[in-house]
């Protein structure tokens, strides 16, 4: 009886706390539940670009590559990159989705990359793997997913660039190094670079160009210590362009 009374008392306290935090706790709970259900219904978010992909496919030749087309596949860092601003007059396609991990991108690789018949693709991924966005992952698991995408690109004659994971910092409002270990970032980048060398792919080194003397993402390149700002993207754009040219030269 005493246990039941304690449980009831605890339930009342929790209910009061929830009510204080939200003017409409039932609505907030429903919104969270709906969001979780939507994620479960389309875990890799194939629907995000389905309409845009269909439109591009309807305009492209039945066979062969679309001249000059490059697909940028990635997470929020790619998603927030206004490619038309940094690569004017280039038929580059942005297929970044905020929060995504390499297993999600691997599922998206066919509809969002292969089916668009690009000459080249740039993959920037891994930071959310380290954060465990879709569950715990090892560095080997991340490398395996990148390798699978690389093999798909090779089979479909897509010149591939794999980018380093960017550094993070604690200079912003949140300590990004808590979820994104700088040591793990360095280890993952070493693996990516080694894989690219072994398989004749272009490794795009954003990391060293954005790093400060403390081993952090330079403060002037980010407002939150994780995502590049305009100045950060300005550094990244010419590096990406050089890497794309190098990748295309290798397949000619």
Predicted regions and their residues:
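Hydrophobic residues at beta-strand termini and immediately following loops
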Residues: 73, 95, 204-206
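Cell-envelope and extracellular/periplasmic
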Residues: 96-98, 125-126
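Alpha-helical cap/lid subdomain in secreted, periplasmic
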Residues: 85-91, 106-252
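N-terminal secretory targeting modules
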Residues: 1-71, 83, 245-252
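Catalytic nucleophile-elbow at a beta strand-turn-alpha helix junction centered on a G-D-S/GDSL motif
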Residues: 67-83, 98-101
């Amino acid at each position: 009886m005493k246990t039941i009374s304690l449980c009831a008392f605890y339930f009342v306290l929790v209910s009061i706390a929830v009510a204080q935090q939200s003017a409409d706790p039932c609505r907030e709970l429903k919104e969270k539940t709906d969001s979780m259900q939507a994620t479960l219904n389309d875990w890799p978010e194939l629907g995000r670009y389905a309409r845009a992909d269909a439109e591009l496919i309807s305009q492209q030749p039945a066979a062969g590559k679309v001249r000059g087309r490059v697909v940028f596949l990635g997470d929020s860092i790619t998603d927030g990159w206004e490619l038309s601003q940094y690569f004017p007059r280039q038929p580059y396609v942005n297929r970044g989705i905020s929060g995504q991990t390499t297993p999600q991108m691997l599922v998206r690789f066919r509809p969002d990359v292969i089916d668009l018949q690009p000459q080249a693709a740039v993959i920037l991924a891994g930071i959310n793997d380290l954060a465990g966005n879709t569950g715990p992952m090892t560095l080997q698991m991340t490398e395996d997913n990148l390798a699978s995408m690389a093999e798909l690109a090779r089979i479909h004659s897509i010149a591939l660039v794999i980018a380093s994971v960017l550094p993070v910092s604690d200079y912003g409002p949140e300590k990004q190094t808590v979820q994104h270990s700088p040591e793990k970032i360095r280890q993952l980048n070493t693996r990516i670079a080694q894989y690219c060398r072994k398989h004749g792919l272009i490794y795009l080194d954003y990391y060293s160009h954005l790093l400060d003397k403390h081993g952090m993402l330079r403060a002037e390149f980010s407002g939150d210590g994780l995502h590049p700002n305009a100045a950060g993207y300005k550094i990244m754009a010419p590096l990406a362009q050089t890497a794309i040219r190098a990748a295309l030269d290798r397949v000619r």
